[in-house]
């Protein structure tokens, strides 16, 4: 009995000692709280919280800062911005999903059609003379812009020739609107000799296309359509100007000032709408 009582006493003494060491004292709690406060939530002299190296908010803030720093550099290396309409690359699950096949097939067909039209116009926009002929035939910047946007929109990723597409489009737009420099002079002038020579050198097919474009614009102008309506019909400002020249407007500026002013307003409206 004495041995049993002795063992029971030793057990209670050991248990009490373990509980005593495991229970935190008030001093240790205060010390630990101060340490955590000092490590995680320090405050500067202005009363603003200072993030620590292991703070999750600081890590996220640094990651956002790195993204904002690297993004402009990535765009500069690419030389061109991805079109906002460009479709992101489809995931494997999306490709295997039969429900997405009709849409993907439709996108492929529209992309092929846009590429087909682009190939047809390559010879028509390869140099300054070919661009001049295309303008006389009624090719407008809006037509090229639609082809460009379709290629970017229906491609599953950035087209491999994205930079060239943008460059060719910008070259055509610059040369197109450069033809109106004489229109805004006082008095307005039109370079007739250049276009008469190009017209004489055209093939019979090209001359038919040119006359068709002039007749089409003539019908719209004679009907008195507003500028908004003319823009919606994609009436070429250049063909419009050539129509006035053929009607002798620029030979008698004083008596045709209203027609010339209407053309000026339309050219500006067309350019503004194109840049939207």
Curated annotation (Swiss-Prot):
Compartment list: Secreted; Host nucleus; Host cytoplasm
Signal peptide start-end: 1-18
Keywords: Host cytoplasm, Host nucleus, Secreted, Signal, Virulence
Motif (RxLR-dEER): 49-64
GO CC field: extracellular region; host cell cytoplasm; host cell nucleus
Family assignment from sequence similarity: Belongs to the RxLR effector family.
UniProt function note: Secreted effector that partially suppresses the host cell death induced by cell death-inducing proteins.
Domain comment, as recorded: The RxLR-dEER motif acts to carry the protein into the host cell cytoplasm through binding to cell surface phosphatidylinositol-3-phosphate.
Name of the protein described by the UniProt record: Secreted RxLR effector protein 150
